[in-house]
Amino acid sequence: MKIKIITLGEKPPKWVSDGYDEYKKRLSKSIPLELIELPIAKRTKTGNPKLWMEQEAKTILGKLNDSDHLVILDVNSKIISTEELADKMQNWKFNNPNVVILIGGPDGIDQSIKDIAKEKISISKMTFPHPLVRIIIAEQLYRAYTILEGHPYHK
């Protein structure tokens, strides 16, 4: 199984990259993680967020393959626990070896992307800075992996 995380936004601060890299390193022997950072559409004060999301959707689609199992993070979807994520990872391992987790841009994810997503999940009803979400997702993937492996990291 391979997991790609696609995120939209500007280059994050070093501490974000360091945090993400720590969990990527921990997972690297078993589950390769790939981070794809895409730029957000250019925003203006009088612009249209729907158009921006449509532009971003085109960029996202250019990074997806037909074999990808697209999972989007969506605040309006079901909040899952770490144990539920572990169950999903177990299923992905056997049924969907190319998983893509999408962290949307500041205005959300275009409906065209939502329509092709295989799964929609939420990590919280709270709002987090998008750069921080990549650390949270990487850590949760690692934690879920340790549950599956019986490792004491998750207690």
UniProtKB/Swiss-Prot annotation:
> Catalytic activity, per the record?
pseudouridine(1915) in 23S rRNA + S-adenosyl-L-methionine = N(3)-methylpseudouridine(1915) in 23S rRNA + S-adenosyl-L-homocysteine + H(+)
Q: Does the keyword NAD apply?
A: no
User: Domain of life, per the record?
Assistant: Bacteria
Predominant location: cytoplasm
Report the transmembrane regions from the record.
none
Which key words tag this protein in UniProt? Answer: Cytoplasm, Methyltransferase, rRNA processing, S-adenosyl-L-methionine, Transferase
Q: Name one GO cellular component term.
A: cytoplasm
Places the protein is found: Cytoplasm
Gene3D superfamilies attached here?
Answer: 3.40.1280.10
EC number(s) in its UniProt entry? Answer: 2.1.1.177
Q: Which GO terms describe its molecular function?
A: rRNA (pseudouridine-N3-)-methyltransferase activity
Q: Which Pfam families match?
A: SPOUT_MTase
The family database entries (InterPro entries) matched by this protein are listed as:
Alpha/beta_knot_MTases, RlmH-like, tRNA_m1G_MTases_N
Q: Which cysteines are joined by disulfide bonds?
A: none
Entry binding sites for S-adenosyl-L-methionine: L73, G104, I123, S124, K125, M126, T127, F128
Q: How does it assemble?
A: Homodimer.
**Which NCBIfam families does this entry report, sorted A to Z?**
PRK00103.1-4, tRNA_RlmH_YbeA
Physiological role: Specifically methylates the pseudouridine at position 1915 (m3Psi1915) in 23S rRNA.
The entry assigns this protein to a family as follows:
Belongs to the RNA methyltransferase RlmH family.
Which HAMAP family does the entry link to?
23SrRNA_methyltr_H
> What is the protein name stated in its UniProt record?
Ribosomal RNA large subunit methyltransferase H
Q: What is the native source organism of this protein?
A: Francisella tularensis subsp. novicida (strain U112)
